[in-house]
Amino acid sequence: DSVARQAKVVILDTFGELFDAYSVASVVFCGASLVPLGGQNPLEPAAWGKPVFYGPSMEDFLDAREALEAAGGGKTVPDAQTLAEELIEVLKDPQLLQAMGEKARTAVFEHQKAAENHAAHIEKLLMQTGRQRQ
């Protein structure tokens, strides 16, 4: 754990351990997205307030990608070269790093109650429909 906190770059290829690992990151790249594999969940690092980068293959997380990009906390990169350039730019600018991270976190928490709001709306519609049938 202390080694990971001091390392400049940490690469993880694991399941179920990433959420906590994001806490020590400065910036996160979501794998399986530069190749056509659908990407990884960008909301987990965003919840930690980390800027999130990913490739164009985010089919499994389209809504999350759109929310992060709309907020300014996530960014699509077309290839590894562009990823490297973007990471260097963000890591060289602490204010940009912090701003992107805050925007990423805000995007997550603005959408956090979406399921609850949808359920309430559906319940209301069902109640109205039930009354009309009686």
Where are these regions (language model features)?
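Nucleotide-activated sugar donor-binding and catalytic core shared by glycosyltransferases
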Residues: 1-134
